[in-house]
Amino acid sequence: MRVKSVYKKLSVSFILVMLSASQEVNSQAKVSVNLNVKHVVGGISEFDRTKYITIHANQIENEWDGDNFTSDLRDHFLNGFDVYLGRDTGGITWNLNNMQEDASRPGFANPSNIISKGINTRNNYASKTHLHVYENRKSNHVVAAQLHPFWTGESQIATKGTGWELASPTATGEYMGRYFNEFYGGNGEPVPSWIEVINEPAYEALGGKKNFTNSLQEIADFHVEVADAIRVQNPNLKIGGYTAAFPDFETGDFQRWINRDKLFIDVAGEKMDFWSWHLYDFPVIGGKEDIRSGSNVEATFDMHDHYSMLKLGHKKPYVISEYGAQTHDFRNEGWSSYRDWLFVRAQNSLMMSFMERPEDIAMAIPFTIVKAEWGFNTDKNLPYPARLMRKANEPESYTGEWVYTDRVKFYDLWKNVKGTRIDTKSTDLDIQVDAYVDGNKGYLILNNLESEETEITLDVFEKYDSSITNILKRHLTLSSNNVVIEEETFSSSISTVQLGAGSTMILEYTFANSLTIDETSTEEKYYADSYLQPIVASQPILFAVNNVVKSATYGEAVLRLGLGRDHGKSLKPIVKVNNTEVVVPDDWRGYDQADKGRFFGTIEIPVSYDLLTTNNTVSVEFPDSSGHVSSVIMQVFNFSSDIRTLSVNDVTASDTKTLLISPNPVKDGMLNMTIPAKLKNPIASIYNVSGSLLIKQSMKHSQTSIPVNLFDKGVYLLVLQDGSKKIGESKFVIQ
């Protein structure tokens, strides 16, 4: 968690301040990686570039062509950075605006005209064979209808080219179904994977971001009728909505949720194949920051999934068809690298949350357009901000050849990442972490939700001791208000890195041999029997989390507690699982949400795996009233073995792992530890929680005892070294 830190427009000065209560000694976050442990969620364990490394574009767009710095921009960008095509809203809308009305059925598109235009479009595409090679980059493509002229309710607008209005949602759906039948397939473009009924219908119709009283009923009904009409023409299309611009559930003490998103699930949920959202950080809005990244986006997913489980009995996938940052305070300014920084910072932070739920995310598309010349503001002489490309002489003048904006650095950073997801763990919730293994390559991704530089201790464990031949460190950060990727190469293991404020780092490890993955961590979420419960002071709120499967002897669990409360109210309740009180952390992902109307976030509470049973009770009690518990979810990780504890026989001089110590807690003044026989010069050090060194001594092999009877009660850290090389560490408690 970080406290509020306003993004500055002209100069940015980041100060090294460690604020997280969960950080280790010396204010360091620690990241642990098990290279041999596969992390499986919903049967998925691979990094799917087709859903994460995307752009809001189609390969047929003319904007790829022109006076570019490279002769073939499609190839340079899509193939060069291994990027996939995300979304198209233009073709379906342009064609409706120029479609003839059916003379015998006023308000309906002429089927014959749809057929003829479809044939022409397919034949035109078939003739452009240079575009066909990119079909493999749109296997997860999204097509969306724009609000106008598709919307048939209040504020309806006629088609621009032909001047007639659609008669009803059924007329809208019939056109869309016929459009996909005639314009795609055969010698045309591949049929898109995901169809959004309409783009952001509530944005202008229901009072904006802060409104919570207007109802989504008409929009929900529209989705039902359109979906039914599409399926009459083509029952195989995947249809979703409502393409929400601001899924701010907590507004109005959750009245916005009740009047909009809950209502949409109730009315249209059974008709939707997926949910469609737009998720943005607002890092500069009236001199303030309104950030969704971190605990807020976690709570948003958790609440929506929880209610879907209660209402529908299952979750549905999400198409995040736009995401990133809206940079309001820069709207009257030209291009700048700093504005691009605000976007890629949000893009990385949000995508890390998406990657944690691979079974739920069908597609995630940052709102980056190729050139967006259609959005040039002629009144202000300003280009559209959300662009991959810019004129070389911007911002001074809109002249020169087309070159990349600094948004390309996101794609440059991620260009090599692929493989099997492996087990990772961070001691600081503000350090997002993920990792993948592909053959002899390992990719460790670190993202900083803090507004301060953070030192991270790395614990990268390779069970079979395959030696490291190379580490490429790539650090996407801000330097003098410019987005940069700092690169550094190492020929052996590194133990710490400095991660810049709001920055992302990818460490690409190369090993001498292919890595063996022979253990698993299988993740599953279990939802309580109720949600959105009001908070009354000193009154426990009871939840049942049933049918939990513990399929292993070893594992971990996290109680995900969604909270919506006014600022100043407690975020640290008394929580009991099966009548046993658990420790609620003071930290959560991201900042304190001070500029938001209220706090809405997920508090992640570690729960002992041994405490879980098949059917569980959870009690939540606050000292003060108001607000709601929005969701209660038990996140369970079943391990194939004890992956958190290192056997003495597995320790080598290159390992950094949890040590075997006993007893813990220490009650008799003596701490016992096992020293691996392979160590040549074992040294043990004990630190307190402030990072002060209390004792450091050479050790003998075999079972060894360290007297700690002179230490006060509390939490300490034991660190074992072999000479100057750190081998492992363990926390222990003195009672």
Swiss-Prot record:
Endohydrolase that cleaves the beta-1,4 glycosidic bond between beta-D-galactopyranose-6-sulfate (G6S) and 3,6-anhydro-alpha-L-galactopyranose (LA) unit of funoran, a polysaccharide produced by red algae of the genus Gloiopeltis. It releases the disaccharide LA-G6S as the predominant end product. Also acts as a random endo-acting beta-agarase, which can hydrolyze agarose tetrasaccharides and hexasaccharides, and produces disaccharides as smallest products. Besides typical agarose oligosaccharides, it can use methylated galactoses. It is an enzyme of class 3 (hydrolase). One of its GO terms (molecular function) is beta-agarase activity. The keyword Hydrolase applies. Belongs to the glycosyl hydrolase 86 family. The active site is at E200, E322. Agarase activity is enhanced in the presence of NaCl. Agarase activity is significantly inhibited by Zn(2+) and slightly activated by several divalent ions including Mg(2+), Cd(2+) and Ca(2+). Residues 1-27 form the signal peptide. Its EC number is 3.2.1.222, 3.2.1.81. Optimum pH is 6.5 with agarose as substrate. Exhibits more than 80% of maximum enzymatic activity at a relatively broad pH range from 6.5 to 10.5. An accommodation pocket formed by Phe-367, Tyr-280 and Gln-326 at subsite -1 (cleavage subsite) contributes to the methyl-galactose tolerance of Aga86A_Wa. Docking simulations show that the canonical tetrasaccharide of funoran (LA-G6S)2 could adapt to the active cleft, and the G6S could be accommodated by the subsite -1. The lineage of its organism: Bacteria, Pseudomonadati, Bacteroidota, Flavobacteriia, Flavobacteriales. InterPro entries: BPA_C, Glycoside_hydrolase_SF, Porphyrn_b-sand_dom_1, Secre_tail. It catalyses: Endohydrolysis of beta-(1->4)-linkages between beta-D-galactopyranose-6-sulfate and 3,6-anhydro-alpha-L-galactopyranose units in funoran; Hydrolysis of (1->4)-beta-D-galactosidic linkages in agarose, giving the tetramer as the predominant product. Keywords: Carbohydrate metabolism, Glycosidase, Hydrolase, Signal. Optimum temperature is 30 degrees Celsius with agarose as substrate. This is Funoran endo-beta-hydrolase. NCBIfam families: Por_Secre_tail.
